[in-house]
């Protein structure tokens, strides 16, 4: 396989595009170009070509992993799944995640703490926080520690109810407010106590609460 042309400037993703004599193209990062000492006219035997394809895939997975982690807090499992969904080779995705861990760029314990902190700041209940940890694929071994100091949400629930309801609110409006709080992960018991504190009649909600 022969290098027919090599772009001298990278694209927006930082890749240098190489065109080969068989018409195929590869977007390579600078390190890969330098590691293989590529230049226009260079001949690669089959072993070298295969090594280049492997190296290109590994570097692609690593760089994509860096971009994902830079944009959002992710767990090890979540990162690996995202890489595969984006088209990276499963084995190379696994290796990229291991590389990220070695670089201390992925930490499930720290991610769990960040997820829980975000839920608290948004006024979400404990169940919503657990759902968020599950969706982020955080291993359960980190859940208890991250959730240990989850604050009581009664004040936030009360403030929410006050913003939605008043003395003239009917049962339909109350139910709508309750449903909104349930979606935010608050328990029926805590919501009922807040309603009682605000002097709303919860007798009709007994079976649901």
Annotate each PLM feature.
Residues 1-209:
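An alpha-helical, amphipathic repeat domain used for nucleic-acid recognition
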């Amino acid at each position: 396989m022969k290098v027919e042309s090599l772009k001298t400037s990278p694209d927006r993703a930082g890749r240098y595009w190489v065109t080969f004599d068989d018409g195929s193209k590869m977007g390579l990062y600078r390190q890969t170009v330098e590691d293989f000492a590529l230049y226009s006219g260079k001949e690669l035997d089959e072993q070298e070509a295969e090594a280049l394809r492997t190296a290109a895939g590994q570097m692609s997975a690593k760089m994509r992993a860096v971009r994902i982690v830079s944009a959002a807090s992710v767990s090890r499992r979540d990162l690996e799944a995202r890489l595969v969904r984006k088209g990276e080779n499963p084995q190379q995705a696994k290796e990229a995640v291991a590389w990220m861990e070695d670089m201390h760029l992925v930490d499930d314990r720290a991610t769990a703490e960040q997820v829980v902190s975000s839920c608290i700041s948004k006024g979400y209940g404990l169940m919503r926080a657990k759902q968020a940890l599950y969706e982020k694929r955080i291993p359960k071994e980190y859940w208890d520690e991250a959730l240990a100091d989850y604050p009581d949400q009664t004040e936030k629930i009360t403030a929410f109810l006050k913003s939605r309801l008043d003395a003239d609110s009917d049962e339909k409006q109350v139910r709508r407010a309750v449903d909104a709080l349930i979606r935010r992960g608050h328990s029926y018991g805590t919501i009922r106590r807040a309603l009682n504190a605000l002097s709303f009649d919860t007798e009709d909600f007994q079976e649901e609460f």
